[in-house]
Amino acid sequence: MGESERSEAFNPPREAGMSSGDIAELEQLRREIVVLREQLEHAVGPHGSVRSVRDVHQLEARIDSLTARNSKLMDTLKEARQQLLALREEVDRLGQPPSGYGVLLAAHDDETVDVFTSGRKMRLTCSPNIEVASLRKGQTVRLNEALTVVEAGTFEAVGEVSTLREVLADGHRALVVGHADEERIVCLAEPLVAENLLDGVPGALNDDSRPRKLRPGDSLLVDPKAGYAFERVPKAEVEDLVLEEVPDVSYQDIGGLTRQIEQIRDAVELPFLHKELYREYALRPPKGVLLYGPPGCGKTLIAKAVANSLAKKMAEVRGDDAREAKSYFLNIKGPELLNKFVGETERHIRLIFQRAREKASEGTPVIVFFDEMDSIFRTRGTGVSSDVETTVVPQLLSEIDGVEGLENVIVIGASNREDMIDPAILRPGRLDVKIKIERPDAEAAQDIYSKYLTESLPVHADDLTEFDGDRAACIKAMIEKVVDRMYAEIDDNRFLEVTYANGDKEVMYFKDFNSGAMIQNVVDRAKKNAIKSVLETGQPGLRIQHLLDSIVDEFAENEDLPNTTNPDDWARISGKKGERIVYIRTLVTGKSSSASRAIDTESNLGQYL
């Protein structure tokens, strides 16, 4: 509505008959309306609605900003409050009095415990948070400033190492020996007591995954002040030298030693399998067997087969499953027994026989096998740089036939220099049976070859065709041909010419130095040649020519091996005994004569290897 329209609305025509007084009052009202309208327009303005919305938006934005700042301040205050609480806890923790530790000795029904702490034995109370029934003897416990048990820990992990002499009758104490040979009685922590009680659990000793019973010679972790032994410490010094597992080797795996196998079975198996007959005839079983002969002829292999066969025979006698047959084969690595410290070698020997007696007390046969016996039990007085054999040999003698008898234990020794072993060990009553493992002859060599050349091997088609596809006949012919080639006394097989001290000369062939190890090496070479032939020609199968070529290669590798510096010592190791050898000349085809060497002075035999 315009200004003129508004004026006309409030200005009626004069001819309406209004009085002058009414008109004056109307004008006064009109002026007041105009003043009020001006005031309103001045307060709101012509665009009042738009300005009001803009102000509202600005206010809302400011409110949002203030709200965000307020939230951030609240989060900062919360974080500061948490840090303050953590710092307060840290201050409280740092301000706590120190805690002591002790070893639990015993627990009582009145919720008190005996604890060894600070060199004193004390009876203390326990915190309500501690279950006294769950505490175990030997356990470490934490004490507060009031000497109250507030926490149960683990068992002590550090301390002195002592050797177990024996477990006392109560099963909770043991006699141990310290470093200075001081004997003391200590209590066994509950884990050790539990291990020692496994003797009554069926199959506990046969399960390697479970703890075993304590035995003399074990190393124990001991706290001498508290008087407790906490755990058994593995001993590398003896554990590495002894192999208790029975090797999976049978007499059927050994070729060419039928007579020797029968001898050792008579010496070892008969006394264990027919104890009643031995008692009836008042016959004492042999205590030991010596296997001697040149290297690589099966001494160690026979010893392994003895343990395997004996375990199975004992299982048959007892009616047990032969697959679960159990016996103990203590394989002693001779040279590793030697120790630079005086008395250590003797101590190791004592520990070995202690273990053997313990196993034998269960009624299970135990074989103690000393490989390379000449390295540790030499003739007394022959040492050059030391006289260790003067005490090591008597220690073995006292163990074999000392005051303590060896029941169900037999000692087997192996050596290629039996002349260097002390005679006191070899006398009857100690190593009663002496079996010579000789080099294989042609017949024995065929038997050995048959162990490696079996019908399961792939044979070349051309060789099979010669025998009309008969694989067994082809393998047999291969063995016969390779043995004939190896044992033929032809110029190509000549090896050495030796001159004895009396002037006699003798030509030796490779067959005189053959061994089971050499035969195995020949077969392995032939198999490798067959594989190379497959890769080159694509024709699979083993051929006779592969074996013949392997013999030539094997002989060629051995032509430089004879020791021409000390020929007599070399000959003794190789199995040639008798007249002293002073001169060796190699006769291998193509070998120059410069390889021969004369020995003008006689060497001290048995001194150098």
Curated annotation (Swiss-Prot):
Any one GO molecular function term: ATP binding
GO cellular component: proteasome complex
UniProt keyword Nuclease present: no
Region annotation (Docks into pockets in the proteasome alpha-ring) ranges: 608-609
Region annotation (Disordered) ranges: 1-22
Superkingdom of origin: Bacteria
Binding positions for ATP per the UniProt entry: 296-301
One Pfam assignment: Prot_ATP_ID_OB_C
Pathway entry: Protein degradation; proteasomal Pup-dependent pathway
Residue stretches in coiled coil: 20-96
UniProt-listed GO biological process terms: modification-dependent protein catabolic process; proteasomal protein catabolic process
Alphabetic keyword roster: ATP-binding, Chaperone, Coiled coil, Nucleotide-binding, Proteasome
Function: ATPase which is responsible for recognizing, binding, unfolding and translocation of pupylated proteins into the bacterial 20S proteasome core particle. May be essential for opening the gate of the 20S proteasome via an interaction with its C-terminus, thereby allowing substrate entry and access to the site of proteolysis. Thus, the C-termini of the proteasomal ATPase may function like a 'key in a lock' to induce gate opening and therefore regulate proteolysis.
Domain note: Consists of three main regions, an N-terminal coiled-coil domain that binds to protein Pup and functions as a docking station, an interdomain involved in ARC hexamerization, and a C-terminal ATPase domain of the AAA type.
NCBIfam families per the UniProt record, alphabetical: pup_AAA (TIGR03689)
Subunit and partners: Homohexamer. Assembles into a hexameric ring structure that caps the 20S proteasome core. Strongly interacts with the prokaryotic ubiquitin-like protein Pup through a hydrophobic interface; the interacting region of ARC lies in its N-terminal coiled-coil domain. There is one Pup binding site per ARC hexamer ring. Upon ATP-binding, the C-terminus of ARC interacts with the alpha-rings of the proteasome core, possibly by binding to the intersubunit pockets.
Protein family according to the UniProt entry: Belongs to the AAA ATPase family.
Identification of the protein by name: Proteasome-associated ATPase
Native organism: Mycobacterium leprae (strain TN)
This protein's encoding gene: mpa
